[in-house]
Amino acid sequence: MAKAELSGQRERAERLRALHRPPPILVLPNAWDVASALVFASLPGCQAIATSSAGVAVALGYPDGEAIPRDVMLEAVARIAAAVELPVTADLEAGYGPAPEDAAATADGAIAAGAVGLNLEDGSADGDGRLVEPAAHAAKIRAVREAARRRDVPLVLNARVDVYLRGVGEPQTRLEETVARATAYRTAGADCIFVPGIDDADTIAALVSAIDAPINVLATAATPPVPALERLGVARVSVGSGLFRSALAFAERSARGVLEQGSFDFAADALPYPDLARLFRRESRHQTTGKE
């Protein structure tokens, strides 16, 4: 990696890290391709871009859950990172393999692709609903941290705890289990703790109070609005595959209107073609001149 390119990547990593010190809360749209990343990056309130593992996979014809080959996922991340000047953090699921070496190789590839942050989840990649042992996931985190050190990029590592999302254990035990896992992951080198599957303010507040790390929540229709999350002390909120699924739902409704009612009403809400062209002219200039 060229010296100027490495310097720029370090700067973006530090910028992303600084955004995890609320207030204000960091609101992350999750892109699934270059077009969605360019749209999000063009908005005044967008300070960084996340990728959606589900969105990237499904858009390329794969189911979610590490069915997409690692090199294909990283190529998508590279295209997104090259298209925008904002920091990009990549959702890389469980790290593409059970061993710390697997997670380290994935992190190394993500940094080479231009990412400056990544998600690493403790849910089992085989889809059986289990979580990996905390010590095993902590070992992956340490391996990712070391891979970033070797690359000399201060990667922002967002460790995902899937206790609530996967409904692990009895409801009354989930808070304690989440805090225990989060503490282990933080000690291993995680910068932020991501707890999807929580929507009620009391649980969110309890996690913010008990975990000595910035907290990331996943937005759903039931999640408190951004100002309320900020008051609760949440550092980061991401939308996961939500915007991707919303785009698919809009496409489905639009096509249904055309095919079943012969209506073209959808066109009134479409992105104007000149705006689309402007996005890609800007992206083309960016690719030509480079980030620095």
Question: What function would you assign to each model-found segment?
Answer:
Residues 2-5, 242-292:
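Extended, intrinsically disordered, low-complexity segments
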Residues 2-239, 246-253:
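Alpha/beta enzyme core
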